[in-house]
Amino acid sequence: MNVKQVINRAFMQIGDTPQEQYTPYHLLEYYNEGNHLLNALIGQYCPSLAQATHEDNGTGRITLPGQCISVLNVKVDDADVQAYHVLNLQTIVFDADHEQKITVDYIMTAGYKKLEDESGLPAELETLLVDYIVYRVMNLDISGVTANMVNALQSINDGLGNNESVIAEGYWNYGSKRIDYAG
């Protein structure tokens, strides 16, 4: 479904199908806002839905084709890199003394969609974006929609067989990765 169709569904729900009170571009702004929120939640709760991979050769540095919101994994010659830094949301650097094959798994930024663009999302998540738009237009609290997004992403993740563990995180982050305890 393209973005204009998603926005038309929101127009139906707010009772403004003649588009007298709001323009499609007004609702497009809410769509992009909701899409950015959803993309961040996808990175946290169901990364396989939006995971991208980039490979290149380099000496301790690789530049991604676009900005990312999360780096899931960095490998050098098929071995995990534990210590790396992300610069300007696009460049990954680490200590190396010779050229190697570098592979990065990451979550891209959502970017800004235009009306004619495809949403690229499953229908269930498009419906949640419609809900988000309606809530923003009506100035309602979006915490309920956000909770529904999290629940939907966890259900999708469970359905993909990716959630067979309990996630434990400490109070203080210290920049470490999360610990998954398999059940």
Feature roles, as predicted:
Residues R9, Q13-P24, E33, L37:
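Subunit-assembly interface segments of extracellular/virion macromolecular structures
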Residues Q21-P24, Y45-A52, T146-N151:
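Short, glycine/acidic-rich hinge or "gate" loops at secondary-structure transitions
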Residues N57, L64-I69, D95-E99, Y174:
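A generic structural signal for short, non-catalytic loop/turn and secondary-structure boundary residues
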Residues H36, A40-N57:
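Extracellular ectodomain segments of secreted/surface proteins
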Residues Q51-P65, K113-A123:
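Surface-exposed ligand/attachment interfaces on beta-rich extracellular proteins
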Residues M1-R9, E29, H36, A40, ...:
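Internal mixed-charge
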